Each structure stands twice: as C-alpha cells, then as structure tokens.
C-alpha cells in the first residue's frame, strides 16, 4: 500500500490566469456592499466591490488605450501613478489652479496618500502586488486615477 502525501495548499497571493477573461463576482460585491453599509469607514470593502465588479474591464480598457498614439506611449512608458502621486516634490511642482494643484490640496486636506490607498487596495487581495502584466498595470492606473475623479467631481469619501 502506498502512502499518499498531502499536497501543500498555497497560502500566499494567487497568480491570475490572464489568458482567461475575468468574470464579475456579484455575490462578493453584495457581501462587501453590506459590510460597507455597516461601516462607511471600511475602505477595504470599496476595493472588494471594485475587484468583484470589474470583471474583464481592465483588459478591455487597455485594448482601447492602445488604439491611440498617446495611449500607446503611456502603455510603453508604464508609469506607476501611485509612485508618481506619492512623490511630494513632484506634486509640489504642479501649478495652482490645475488638476494637479487640486490634487495637492486634496492630499493636504484629507491626509490621504496615493501609496496608502494602494496599500488598502491590497489589504485583503488574494493576488500579488505589482504584477508585471499590461492588464494589471492598467488596473492599478485606473485605481490610482480614482482619486482624481473625486477631485474633479467634488465627491468626498465621507
């Protein structure tokens, strides 16, 4: 009789199979929404909802990005916005009256940081951080631009 060995179960972040379209996870989104309604300060739930509902959006939007010359240049450069938005010296060069100036005022007023929000987005994620894949990069870019939408619309986190 052969002894069977138990296979080790993965305990760390899981790799995403980028060859398969991602599906929306409605149940996950609903559970996170209910938790968020119970505690509006639980920012982790916001990112759970976003991940659950995004489905294949990052892949589709990345393909759209590549349809323009400027988009192709952005994709080629692959600048990580959380790093750029965390560079206070760079932020301080942005002129008053610009979107960048409004972003600086937002950071000063709220005490938020781009890296802090990026960290929260991974607080319960079962995927690796900073995966080097075009769709993952684009998903991070969409996450990091989210604060800019708050600034432009005047929508506050509270």
Summary of predicted features, one role per range:
Residues 2-65, 72-78, 89:
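Extended, charge-biased low-complexity segments
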Residues 47-158:
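Core of folded catalytic or high-affinity ligand/protein-binding domains
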Residues 1-2, 154:
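Short intrinsically disordered, low-complexity coil segments enriched in acidic
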